[in-house]
């Protein structure tokens, strides 16, 4: 085919190009016509008033472009006024901002072309507001023009503008910090915004802004009496979500605000949470009202903080001298003083019929021991029962136990006489002269148990127990050592350090005694970071021979060291590094336990991730036992860290579910105990149904721990569903003596103190972690991790460490004369009111009672009468003051 033919059949190049151009032109025309149509439609939709506003704004923009400097000023002023009045309420995009959208970049060019002048700063103000809607947010143009504009109050432009400005300040501050650029101008601007937030129910925005700038303490001067409680509530609720040391800075700010308005009881709660003795002393010394001082003494007593208040009556309150009397008053008012026997708890007539019970002597002894524990737990603190404290000593249940069972049976007198020191000592005294060594050892341990949480100037526990530290059998010495640890937990006593340190360091001493001495020192100096105790234990770990490193009691030496750093976070780093340099199994256990305890209850996500990583690593074959123990502790540590923060606690439940499916046996046996710690005395159906499933596991170690954890979860609640599940387990395991023993212990815990007590270590509206309560729970849980060696063998008396966590969940109100004052209170489920405007209700589904009353987990009380004002939040022992004037800021 010729070229002529081709050219005749195909369009020329120019024609094709023209066709393309024509297509593009038509597309552009179509788009323009669409835009024009849209604009015409918008103009047609506008009302006359809006059209007038649009024309006025365009004229003002034109005037800014063309007018002389004199006219520019008036045009800018008019423009500013129109925008300001429209942005004061931002329910929708204000019309002036909408109409000025096409002119934003025109105004930016004008601004850039002008020399520095008052008119330029005025235009910067306008551009700052317009930038909120039109500019590229990554350029922070609202902030840029704000800093270049006039120094008028940013709040003139409305709430939405101020919030937008605050977010840009936070972003700009972060980028400048990375570049190490100065930030003084940002801080100055932030401090002009904070008062606006605080006076417009936006306390959360003010706190967040200053917290991002690392200057949370600067909020204190701006806080007023009417918003102080809301500010502090938001600050304290944020603490669990922040890393160290930001959490400490937040708490110190809340403390400063409370002190500013003389809210001393709230300030003291924050100081206790900080565990700062200097602040605690300052708060106590600042109180001039004797009633307020007494209330503060009761608050310190709950945390077992050792202090001298300089007054006998105050010291009695601080030392829990009358705690037994208060508890007996509660029991009498609730008609609970009649003692119960184990059969009342077991309700064996409701269990499925069984055969072959009691066939062996071993089983019978185990059953009697279980009954001993159940009897002590159910009647704890009531100073009466029908098995042990009987008139005819020959019929006493103590002598129905054998060998090591006698230790626990005799020590149970201490639990029955819990907090009632005088009566407890008089009843235990005769057993100190017993020829039976186990009975004598039990009496020594019982003395420690009855003295838990109660201080006495005469120091009867130390006077008696110190005589048995150096001489006598291992059983007597072990009971005396642990008894001292229980009696003086949290006392921070240097004289006890001198007594117990030689036992820790003596390499010829049995490993059991050294480890118990280290544990007792940990209990006595819990959360103090005491350098002498730490160096003593570290030195012992270095000097102990290799054979001692494999001793099962070694975990308690590691725990003793870990408890010193309870809740101290980064302050434990030096000790962790030292432990890394020490060889041996106990040092590895101590390393992980110190890490766990130092972050206990903080909810620190990074540490939870670190522990989950340890759990996920398959242990190597050559060091299997050591590594699996560390994984066991790590699984437990996840719950220990997450327990103080509800969201974190919810999240780890899913991880635990996965671990039970795919984890190593060493991890699986720790998960039920972790669930028990996470939800102690808080029977959530989701958790105890899960534990019920694990209680039938093929691995008996898992089953034992799941059964015990069911007791922890339901402790002191008398939960009917849990009681039914435990009765079913008693039938299921009727031929397995160890499992049945665990079921009985769990049943005893469920009815702890006849349903009046709790094991949950948190108190004061679940904000403060009780150091000694946590230490007691950890001691028992670590023993349960190897139940066959300890609790199910001859060391079942370790269960008495749980006494440290026992406290009555009562609300008792006292009058100004110190006498019991029954008043009406509303008790209901606590409601999270953080960040809500106004004064919302803090409880829901409430029922009116007359004090004394019991408070369940997550329940809160408020007075139903205006005749009195409580000196602190309604929990524990509260003093009521006759109402003479309205209190602006309530507890």
From Swiss-Prot:
Which molecular-function annotation in GO is an example for this chain? Answer: enzyme regulator activity
Query: Which species is this record about?
Result: Schizosaccharomyces pombe (strain 972 / ATCC 24843) (Fission yeast)
Which top-rank group of organisms is this from?
A: Eukaryota
What family classification does the UniProt entry report for this protein? Belongs to the proteasome subunit S2 family.
UniProt feature, compositional bias: Basic and acidic residues: 17-30
Residue spans of biased composition, Low complexity class: 1-12
Q: Does the keyword Repeat apply?
A: yes
Q: Name one GO cellular component term.
A: proteasome storage granule
Supply the InterPro entries for this chain: 26S_Psome_Rpn1, ARM-like, ARM-type_fold, Proteasome/cyclosome_rpt, RPN1_C, RPN1_N
Q: Where is this region: Disordered?
A: 1-48
Entry keywords, A to Z: Phosphoprotein, Proteasome, Repeat
Q: How does it assemble?
A: Component of the 26S proteasome. Interacts with ubp6.
**General function of this protein:** Acts as a regulatory subunit of the 26 proteasome which is involved in the ATP-dependent degradation of ubiquitinated proteins.
**Any GO BP annotation:** proteasome-mediated ubiquitin-dependent protein catabolic process
Cite the Pfam families for this sequence: PC_rep, RPN1_C, RPN1_RPN2_N
Name of the protein: 26S proteasome regulatory subunit rpn1
Q: Could you confirm whether the keyword Oxidoreductase appears in this record?
A: no
PTM-bearing positions, type Phosphoserine: 10
Which Gene3D superfamilies does its entry note?
A: Leucine-rich Repeat Variant
Q: Could you tell me which residues the PC repeats occupy?
A: 408-441, 442-478, 479-513, 517-550, 673-704, 705-739
């Amino acid at each position: 085919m010729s070229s002529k033919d081709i050219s005749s059949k195909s369009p020329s190049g120019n024609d094709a190009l023209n066709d393309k151009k024509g297509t593009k032109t038509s597309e552009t025309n179509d788009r323009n016509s669409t835009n024009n149509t849209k604009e015409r439609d918008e103009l047609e939709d506008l009302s006359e008033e809006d059209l007038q506003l649009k024309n006025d704004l365009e004229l003002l923009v034109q005037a800014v472009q063309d007018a002389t400097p004199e006219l520019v000023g008036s045009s800018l002023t008019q423009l500013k006024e129109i925008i300001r009045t429209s942005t004061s309420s931002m329910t929708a995009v204000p019309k002036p901002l909408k109409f000025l959208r096409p002119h934003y970049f025109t105004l930016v060019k004008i601004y850039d072309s002008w020399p520095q002048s008052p008119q330029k700063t005025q235009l910067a103000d306008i551009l700052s507001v317009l930038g909120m809607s039109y500019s590229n947010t990554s350029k922070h143009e609202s902030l840029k023009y704000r800093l270049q504009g006039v120094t008028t109050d940013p709040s003139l432009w409305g709430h939405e503008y101020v919030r937008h400005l605050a977010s840009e300040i936070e972003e700009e501050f972060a980028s400048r910090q990375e570049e190490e650029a100065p930030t003084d101008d940002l801080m100055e601007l932030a401090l002009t915004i904070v008062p606006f937030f605080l006076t417009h129910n936006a306390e959360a925005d003010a706190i967040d802004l200053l917290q991002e700038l690392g200057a949370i303490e600067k909020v204190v001067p701006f806080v007023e009496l009417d918003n102080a409680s809301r500010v502090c509530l938001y600050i304290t609720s944020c603490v669990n979500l922040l890393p160290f040391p930001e959490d400490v800075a937040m708490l110190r700010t809340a403390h400063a605000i409370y002190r500013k308005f003389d809210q001393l009881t709230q300030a003291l709660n924050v100081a206790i949470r900080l565990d700062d003795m200097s602040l605690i002393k300052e708060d106590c010394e600042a109180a001039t009202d004797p009633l307020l001082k007494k209330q503060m003494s009761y608050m310190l007593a709950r945390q077992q903080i050792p202090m001298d208040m300089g007054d006998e009556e105050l010291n009695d309150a601080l030392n829990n001298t009358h705690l037994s009397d208060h508890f007996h008053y509660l029991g009498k008012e609730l008609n609970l003083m009649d003692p119960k026997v184990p059969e009342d708890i077991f309700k064996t007539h409701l269990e499925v019929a069984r055969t072959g019970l009691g066939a062996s002597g071993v089983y019978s002894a185990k059953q009697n021991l279980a009954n001993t524990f159940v009897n002590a737990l159910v009647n704890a603190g009531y100073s009466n029962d029908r098995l042990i404290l009987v008139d005819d000593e020959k019929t006493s249940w103590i002598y129905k136990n054998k060998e090591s069972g006698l230790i626990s049976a005799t020590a149970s007198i201490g639990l029955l006489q819990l907090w009632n020191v005088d009566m407890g000592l008089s009843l235990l005294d005769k057993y100190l002269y017993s020829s039976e060594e186990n009975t004598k050892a039990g009496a020594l341990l019982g003395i420690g148990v009855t003295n838990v949480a109660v201080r006495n100037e005469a120091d009867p526990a130390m006077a008696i127990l110190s005589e048995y530290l150096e001489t006598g059998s291992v059983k007597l010495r072990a009971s005396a050592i642990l008894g001292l640890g229980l009696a003086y937990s949290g006392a921070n006593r240097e004289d006890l350090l001198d007594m117990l340190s030689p036992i820790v360091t003596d390499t010829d001493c049995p490993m059991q005694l050294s480890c118990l001495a280290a544990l007792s020192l940990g209990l006595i100096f819990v959360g103090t970071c005491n350098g002498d105790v730490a160096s003593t234990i570290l030195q012992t770990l270095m000097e102990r021979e290799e054979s001692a490193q494999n001793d099962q009691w070694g975990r308690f030496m590691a725990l003793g060291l870990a408890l010193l750093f309870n809740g101290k976070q980064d302050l434990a780093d030096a000790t962790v590094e030292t432990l890394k340099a020490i060889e041996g199994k106990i040092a590895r256990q101590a390393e992980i336990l110190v890490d766990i305890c130092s972050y206990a209850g903080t909810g620190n996500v990074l540490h939870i991730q670190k522990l989950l990583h340890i759990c996920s690593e398959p242990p190597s074959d050559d060091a299997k036992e050591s590594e699996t123990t560390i994984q066991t502790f790590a699984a437990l540590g996840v719950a220990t860290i997450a327990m103080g923060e509800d969201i974190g606690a919810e999240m780890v439940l899913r991880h635990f579910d996965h671990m039970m499916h795919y984890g190593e046996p060493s991890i699986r046996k720790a998960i039920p105990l972790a669930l028990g710690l996470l939800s102690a005395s808080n029977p959530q159906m989701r958790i105890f149904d899960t534990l019920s499933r694990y209680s039938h596991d093929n691995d008996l170690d898992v089953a034992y721990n799941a059964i015990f954890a069911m007791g922890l979860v339901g402790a002191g609640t008398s939960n009917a569903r849990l009681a039914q599940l435990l009765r079913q387990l008693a039938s299921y395991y009727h031929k397995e003596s160890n499992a049945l023993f665990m079921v009985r212990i769990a049943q005893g815990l469920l009815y702890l103190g006849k349903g009046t007590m709790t094991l949950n270590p948190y108190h004061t509206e679940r904000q403060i972690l009780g150091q000694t309560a946590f230490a007691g729970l950890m001691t028992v849980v670590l023993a349960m991790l190897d139940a066959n060696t300890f609790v199910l063998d001859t060391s079942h008396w370790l269960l008495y460490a749980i006494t440290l966590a026992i406290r009555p969940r009562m609300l008792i109100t006292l009058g100004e004369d110190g006498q019991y004052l029954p008043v009406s209170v509303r008790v209901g489920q606590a409601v999270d009111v953080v960040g809500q405007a106004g004064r919302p209700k803090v409880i829901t589904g409430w029922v009116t009672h007359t004090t004394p009353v019991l408070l369940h987990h997550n329940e809160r009380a408020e007075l139903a009468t205006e005749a009195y004002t409580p000196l602190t939040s309604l929990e524990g022992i509260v003093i009521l003051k006759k109402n003479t004037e309205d209190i602006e800021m309530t507890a």
